[in-house]
Swiss-Prot record:
This is Cardiolipin synthase (CMP-forming). It catalyses: a CDP-1,2-diacyl-sn-glycerol + a 1,2-diacyl-sn-glycero-3-phospho-(1'-sn-glycerol) = a cardiolipin + CMP + H(+). It is found in: Mitochondrion inner membrane. Residues 1-34 form a transit peptide.
């Protein structure tokens, strides 16, 4: 201890002893010493840390004692040196290193580093579910419908006794696979987000292409010669409805669940699709001039096409009313 400090402390003690004889109560009492550090650490509480106290506790107590001594003897405060302990370990997080650290969990807890799975099995031995397949059987059938659109256009403009039959067969196969891929996806649980996106696109491409083909090259019968607009009006109604519903469903995908439920497929939409596919199949098949009662086939096909257009507009109105009620709430 420096001599000046010792002299100063000795004078303070003598003054305190002299004052004790004059006053019953001492006018000066030194500060209480800091609490002693227990020799053995206390056991951790239930649910607490499972690690024993480290040098951090001892270093903190030493720093507290040094600060109290500096205040007593009016020394300059000691420099705050960095204390190396358990809390000073680097965070493991998601950065480099990959070791275990403290993170933001507090002292005594370790952050678990999850290793990526290799060949479907994690490093800890737990099996991981396989990633979903992109090309399932329903998705392949849907892609086949999209690829059949150029083939349908090619056979429609071909000349020959087999051209009408080939065009009708392609469209009929597309209509059957439209039902088949949904059935397989539900029964075998093979549905994928990509397939759910591509299925309505394939349907609209096939229907729109067929309607445009029938309008650009109408059948040579008396009914269509007198009224060439008979095919144009339902074609515009059906295509316009499909474009509108595609935009509405795209908007509903960004809204809440109630809006999505409002645009779900209903029975009107199913009846519309059934009458639409039947009408287009009849109109494509009636292009074969060898078929008997060609005029009757064309008339029935046009009538079903108008029924399909009416159901399309009706279902669109129903969807819009549901959405409007939800928006007004």
């Amino acid at each position: 201890m420096p001599p000046s400090v010792a002299t100063h402390a000795s004078l303070l003690l003598k003054a305190a002893a002299a004052a004790a004889h004059l006053h019953p109560k001492p006018f000066f009492s030194p500060r209480a010493a800091p609490p002693r550090i227990p020799s053995a650490p206390a056991p951790p509480a239930a649910g607490g840390s499972r690690y024993r106290p480290t040098t951090t506790t001892t270093a903190a107590a030493t720093a507290t004692s040094a600060t109290a001594a500096c205040r007593w003897f009016r020394w300059p405060p000691p420099a705050q040196a960095p204390v190396r302990g358990l809390c000073s370990l680097p965070h493991s997080g998601g950065g480099g290193g990959g070791g275990e650290g403290m993170g933001s969990e507090g002292v005594g807890r370790r952050r678990r580093v999850v290793a990526p799975a290799v060949n479907g099995v994690a490093k800890d031995g737990a099996p991981q579910p396989p990633p979903p397949k992109l090309l399932t059987l329903p998705t392949v059938l849907t892609i086949g419908r999209v690829a059949a659109v150029p083939l349908l256009i090619s056979t429609f403009y071909m000349e020959g006794p087999w051209a009408a039959t080939a065009t009708t067969g392609i469209f009929l196969a597309a209509a059957v696979t439209d039902w088949l891929d949904g059935y397989i996806a539900r029964k075998m649980q093979l549905g994928t987000p990509f397939g759910a996106f591509l299925d309505p696109v394939a349907d609209k491409l096939m229907v729109a292409a067929t309607l445009v083909l029938l309008c650009t090259k109408p059948l040579e019968i008396s009914l269509l010669r007198d009224g060439p607009w008979l095919l144009t009006v339902p074609a515009i109604a059906i295509i316009g409805r499909e474009i509108t519903m595609s935009a509405v469903r795209e908007w509903a995908a960004s809204q809440n669940t109630k809006v999505l439920e409002a645009v779900a497929v209903n029975n009107l939409g199913k009846w519309k699709t059934a009458t639409q596919m039947t009408a287009l199949t009849i109109l494509l098949a009636s292009r074969d001039k060898s078929l008997p009662a060609q005029d009757a086939l064309v008339t029935s096909g046009i009538a079903l096409l108008y029924v399909s257009a009416g159901l399309a507009i009706w279902s669109l109105v129903v969807y819009m009313r549901k959405i409007w009620r939800i928006l007004l709430k």
